[in-house]
Amino acid sequence: MLRIAALALAVVCAAACTKNSSGPTERGTGTTFFVTSATSTTGNLGGLSGADARCLSLATAVGAGNKTWRAYLSVERDAANGNRPTDARSRIGNGPWFNAKGVPVASNLSALHALKGDSSLFVDEKGQPINGQWVGSPAPVEHDIMTGSTADGTLMAGFTCGDWTSDSTLTVGQVGHSDGFGPNRDTSGALSSWNSAHSNQNCANTAPRGGAGRIYCFAR
C-alpha cells in the first residue's frame, strides 16, 4: 500500500511540475510589452525604424529579443506603407500582452485601449515603474510617453514630431500618461489616458511638461 501511495504521489508531482514549467522561468522571457527605460531629449527617434530598433535593443538586453518588436507610434507618412498614414494600434499585433513582471496588460486591442494609465502595469523592460505623479514616486516626473495618437490608437495628425524625426521647436507630439495621473494626481478628462493625455511643449525638448522621450514597445 505504501509503495502504491508513493507512486501515486510521484505521478501527481510530475504532472504539477510539468504544468508549472510551462510559463516564463526568468524575468523578460515572457515580456511582450514595456515602456522604454531609454530616454530621448527630443522627439527625433530616427522615425519608426529607429524607434523599433530601440524596442528590440532593450528587449534583447533582458532576454526577450526573439520576438518582433514594434514601437507604439502613429505617423502621417510611413515609407513601409506607401507613404500613407499608419496608426499605432495597427503596428502591434492583436495581443495578449504581458509586462516584464509577468502581469497581463491586455488580452486584445479593444481591452488595451479601454485601459487607463497605471504605474504598476506600465513598467519598463526591467519591471521598474516610470517616475510620475503616483504616491512615493521619485523626481523628476517622466510619465509623458510619446505616441502621436488619439485615445483609440489612431493617428493624431500634426502631433507626431515630424513622424518622429524632428527636434524642432515648431513641431509637437501627443503623449500619454503611463501612471494615469495629471498634476496633483488629477484623473479628470484625458489626464488618465495612457496614450493620449496632451501634447508635449515641443519636439526640441521632451522634459518641460513631464516627459523624457520614452515610448511604448509591443511584441507582435
Language model features with spans:
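C-terminal motif of bacterial Sec signal peptides marking the signal peptidase cleavage site
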Residues: 13-16
